[in-house]
Amino acid sequence: EMSASLVGSEMCIRDSIDHYTYLNDHSDLDIMVYNNPNVTSGITRETMKELYKLPHVKIVKDASMVIDVMTDYIFEAEQAEEDKAVLCGCDYLLYSAYATGAIGWISMTANILPKLSADFHKAMIVDKDYQKGLEIYKQLYPVVNMTERFPKPTQAVKYILQEVYGFEEGICRRPRRGISDEEKKLVLEWSEIERLSKTNKN
């Protein structure tokens, strides 16, 4: 599977479509479109509607952190002639995204609480038990809040995996740097991970 995103805030819709059309026509790989407007050019609903017409475009990961953008993608996917799907790329919107029709999510939270994350996915996708899913999401929320709120989420996740779970995580690739002792305290406090890690066991 190929993931492709576009850099440049001035990229026009036609350029976006041409870019993905080129990838579609020159590769047999399935394509995941990545919408991350904080660091790349945002993809409009109209653009996504056109991209869904490309046979190798199968899925879009939306990290816009805007629920109406993700909802637009989901509804356009449902109307597409071929099977298309949406992945949630923002943990804050996790419950809303699943309830609207997202089929999964790409998550920092799942690295820290994999069992609870899997339980949430099962409740929402397999069992269609949205009340149970909501209760699980409430349990996940302190970690969700930390990963979205803390300014160095990658370092925070690595610290938790090493400090709480005992994994040998090593150091982050530059230019990311480690976190201070004060930041480590904030990570543990905000995530409530020392309590929640006990729920991560079978």
Each language-model region and where it sits:
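C-terminal alpha-helical cap/extension of soluble enzyme domains
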Residues: 101-102, 109, 113-202
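Catalytic alpha/beta core domains of metabolic enzymes, predominantly
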Residues: 22-25, 39-141, 147-149
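Glycine-rich phosphate-binding "P-loop"
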Residues: 33-35, 56, 173
